[in-house]
Amino acid sequence: MSDDDSRASTSSSSSSSSNQQTEKETNTPKKKESKVSMSKNSKLLSTSAKRIQKELADITLDPPPNCSAGPKGDNIYEWRSTILGPPGSVYEGGVFFLDITFTPEYPFKPPKVTFRTRIYHCNINSQGVICLDILKDNWSPALTISKVLLSICSLLTDCNPADPLVGSIATQYMTNRAEHDRMARQWTKRYAT
């Protein structure tokens, strides 16, 4: 290698290393910030993933009556649940599918639970959104997905017309119970069997 080549190589490597050093210096604060937020997110993911894994083991060993639930695929945060219409209710004989989505903040924030099967119910709208206090303001980290599913089953047995999501169905429930029950059975037969 000639002296000129050697100088050019040294000069380019020193300018390259000074450019890298300048880039490192300007990027250092950003890396620290992202490490802090990544660390916080990792802890949340770790906490929520551990909790969800434990609940999956529990619900697999001891599922609530007439219910099942578990991950849709490899994503522990996306579950599918099945609820059988409670015996003696207008939903008896129906098989209802629900989606359960956990956030990284779980169990400190409630899971999002929605019906995928259409249902005629004053506390469940046409998008499958459920009006249930424990899925909103009355959520507690002490609650589990098994308890949530039991509460939903209870809602299928005894709706809450005092806090409706679908006002017309709640009014019908209170003023013309026979017609309400007929419609609920009809929808169950049409959409859930």
Swiss-Prot record:
Region Disordered, annotated ranges: 1-45
E.C. number: 2.3.2.23, 2.3.2.24
GO CC aspect terms: cytosol; nucleoplasm; nucleus; ubiquitin ligase complex
Compositional bias annotation for Basic and acidic residues: 22-35
Major localisation: nucleus
Biased composition (Polar residues): 36-45
Domain of life: Eukaryota
Keywords noted in UniProt: Acetylation, ATP-binding, Isopeptide bond, Nucleotide-binding, Nucleus, Transferase, Ubl conjugation, Ubl conjugation pathway
Function of the protein: Accepts ubiquitin from the E1 complex and catalyzes its covalent attachment to other proteins. Catalyzes the covalent attachment of ISG15 to other proteins. Mediates the selective degradation of short-lived and abnormal proteins. In vitro also catalyzes 'Lys-48'-linked polyubiquitination. Catalyzes monoubiquitination of other proteins in both an E3-dependent and E3-independent manner.
Protein name: Ubiquitin-conjugating enzyme E2 E1
Organism of this sequence: Homo sapiens (Human)
Underlying gene: UBE2E1
